């Protein structure tokens, strides 16, 4: 006889009491350790800087670093970057961003490539961007008829993004740090 072990599920009020950095996906807690390394931070900062600059002429949209996004009573995630085109209120977002960026580490690649891919697609995030620092590659997905369609793999090309309230060009080549920065 096969016995099924039921996993305990948690909710946002539980999540709010936890110490440390966690995400809660479909009621399951997932630790966000170890913290992002130097290369991860450089890539994330470069993407943030470019998005910030690109969105400056568009007062309806803004880019935010590592903010909690509460999709349901059992799901709260903290993407590396999000772009929203609605007024943010409170300490977390409770509506889907239009664009999410995750800088992928080998330790959490399954979470970003499978679990969050499905979650963001289901929740209606228009663009999902996965940055791979070691490969110096960025994958871009766009939601089309409720399904992510791969726009492409980008290394140093440019791409135009069309959000609900603005559009902008993004230069993927400017994301990658130069050899031996600040040395």
Predicted regions and their residues:
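Gly/Pro/Ser/Thr-rich low-complexity, intrinsically disordered segments predominantly at protein N-termini
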Residues: 1-183
